[in-house]
Amino acid sequence: MLIPCWDSAGQIHHLEGFPTSFKDWSRGEELSAQRREFLSAVEKVTPSSISSTRDLAVDMNLTLEVTLDDGQVLVVRQCYPSQNDDVEELWRTSKFESEVNLMQWLEQNSRIPVPSIHSVMRRGTDSPAHFIIMSKLPGQVLMNSHSLLSSLAKVFALSHLTVRNTVLELFRLDVPQRIGTTIPSNPGDGLDVRPKIGKQYSLSADRVFDTLEEYMRHLFSLKRKSKSIGDGDTDKARAYSTLTTLEDLVNVHLKSLTSPSLRRCVLMHDDLHDANILVDIHGNITGVLDWEFHSIQPAVLAVGYPAWLSYDDTNDPRFASSSVWWVVGRQESIELRRQYAMIVKVKDLEYYEALVAGLFLRSVVNWLIDEHADPGCLRLRGWMISEEALGESLTQPDQIVPAK
């Protein structure tokens, strides 16, 4: 399916959207020994045999849509085992267990449309890998559907995302007031906190953080160790200088965030992009997927504009990696962001205040966790220079200044 995408010059192209399937299989067709072993393990916990599969995702996890002989359609998500790396295996297992627990907790404690988990299997005698079997939710991924929605439906999708389904409910759920990734509480049916699981095991935290200041110091430390800043002495020296300047600015900014409502810890989906949201033709949000990366963070970091509307920081066309594309044009993104800000301002003033107050800090975090190559932090430095010129407009969501 071709969808409109914009390049850094603002030119529109029609590119392949998120695949509806990477590979289809039906009974009678050839299977690898590894896939045959895995499907046999799945069939041990399904009510009937598997007649066909579709590979929905194949990168960090294997996600299959399976059709059974009795007509049921389910989703199976396999956690790939690590290849002889105990540290990576612990990371993979930890995010699998955390995702399972959080999805079950959200189904019991919220109205957020997460898939219902039918079965959980761990690697062992009966299974070659950890996997879960879930219900299949209706709808299409927003990445493929957004351009097909009417202007009214796009605004309705923002309203539905905030008010009825995800964002504002996450903002108000009762969660522990420490910074990290969730684990089951013991005893009880609540949540506890473990060190934050990163999108790569090398980016995970080694402890739980009590304050926003501690967490920001951790992120700066990770960036200084990141391969993205370059390997040479010159690149590292330039990067360290830029990061020190930015950290000094952040420390000053943190002193202005005095309201307890801005520092209250909030549950957030760390990967809430347009391929992890399902919508119908009217803009109703029908599913929120892929909770393996989530965290509890201060409100100023946990809130934000929808990721697919971003032309900021690492998505600013002047400084973005060459691999970045945009699924919404700049002018439309400005209008939809304005609508989003208006919606949350009416529905939850504290959310809106965190949205405004945290705009600069969230941009900094996006740069610190970005793993695209940036030797010497030259892209980051260019953004810092441009942001200084914007002045007070950094914190005004209704006055978004487009890039020149």
UniProtKB/Swiss-Prot annotation:
Organism superkingdom: Eukaryota
Any matching Pfam family: APH
The record ties this protein, via Gene3D superfamilies, to:
3.90.1200.10
Per its database record, what is this protein's job? Part of the gene cluster that mediates the biosynthesis of clavilactone A, a meroterpenoid that features a unique benzo-fused ten-membered carbocyclic ring unit with an alpha,beta-epoxy-gamma-lactone moiety, forming an intriguing 10/5/3 tricyclic nested skeleton. ClaR, ClaS and ClaT are sufficient to produce clavilactone A and the function of claY, if any, has still to be identified. The biosynthesis begins with the prenyltransferase claS that transfers geranyl pyrophosphate (GPP) to hydroquinone to produces geranylhydroquinon.
Q: What is this protein called?
A: Clavilactone A biosynthesis cluster protein Y
